[in-house]
Amino acid sequence: MVTTLQLTRPDDWHLHLRDGKMLTDIVPATGRRFARAIIMPNLRPPITTTTQALAYRKRILAAQPKNLDFEPLMTLYLTDNTIPEEITRARDSGHIYAVKLYPAGATTNADFGVTCLHKLYPVLEALQQQQLPLLIHGEVTDPAVDIFDRERVFIESHLIPLLHDFPALRVVLEHITTQEAVDFIEAAPPNIAATITPHHLLFNRNALLAGGIQPHYYCLPVLKREIHRQALVAAATSGNPKFFLGTDSAPHAKTAKETACGCAGIYSSHAALELYAEAFEEASALEKLEAFASFHGPDFYGLPRNQDTVTLIKTPWQVPESLPYGDDALIPLRGGTTVAWRLAE
């Protein structure tokens, strides 16, 4: 039985850090586990320009403890008003690695998102020319579409036509949740990839809905049926380089989750790598974790793999029931329960 795992230090290719005084509560947990992270731009107001992204980067670095060497990889928030020249500025900055597409209203702070992709074709052409990846929250927001079908319908109605018009566009379909998304990525050319979260590997929609509403398991895209969870596990453990780690760790105050209309988002940075190890161990595929966590992401982004390592030890520990979050608290994924793997300090 494996009791110790030494891995090339991984990166998180989908992370929410928030802003302001919450940064000092959130950044350290990621920096202890990951060397780099793609930082989501859906602040309020969103990060829509290179100037804003570089300023946000400075705030993140200022919140980092002195003993950590964590690099935030910045992104821009695509809006109906984004111009091609901004894409050039982003690429030339040396610190912006992608542009994020949120369909308007699809998730937290997506009010400024895109309402019509066709109006942004000049921007998408610039992204294709600059080879700057487009990161996509792949769900439709049509109220007539069942929430459990929004990812599948987005792929069929929007993503396939988009890639027909921009075949060389580098795309990451973020936080995939369905068998249909797995099938699409597997059949797609090498410029198309996907991230997978720990919570979508470990849980199906029973965690959210069975035995009473569990607001701390509410995220977007929502947890799906067990058949879809199994498809995600098979993809993550397959060794296919198109699938890589992206936690989508998204902290919200406890009071914003435990309410009549709670926010979508699951916070997992406190134990992200440990939770991935648990999922891979359950699938008898621990030997595949390093490639998924440490190799596939940088290879897709054209970045060097990290040179240092992290070590996980098979020592159960109890996740705190809550963690500090500004003037409030947040409930971490698996709060108050035991996780099988521990990060060696």
UniProtKB/Swiss-Prot annotation:
Q: Which residues carry this modification: N6-carboxylysine?
A: K100
Query: What's an example of a GO molecular-function annotation for this chain?
Result: dihydroorotase activity
- Give the binding site residues for substrate: H16, L17, R18, N42, H137, L220, H252, A264
What positions constitute the catalytic site?
D248
Query: What keywords does the record list, in alphabetical order?
Result: Hydrolase, Metal-binding, Pyrimidine biosynthesis, Zinc
Enzyme Commission number: 3.5.2.3
Record: residues binding Zn(2+) 2:
K100, H137, H175
Q: Which InterPro entries match?
A: Amidohydro-rel, DHOdimr, Dihydroorotase_CS, Metal_Hydrolase
| GO cellular component labels | cytosol
Q: Which cofactor does it need?
A: Zn(2+)
Pathway given in the UniProt record: Pyrimidine metabolism; UMP biosynthesis via de novo pathway; (S)-dihydroorotate from bicarbonate: step 3/3
Task: Provide the assembly information.
Answer: Homodimer.
Q: Indicate the family of this protein.
A: Belongs to the metallo-dependent hydrolases superfamily. DHOase family. Class II DHOase subfamily.
* UniProt-recorded name of the protein: Dihydroorotase
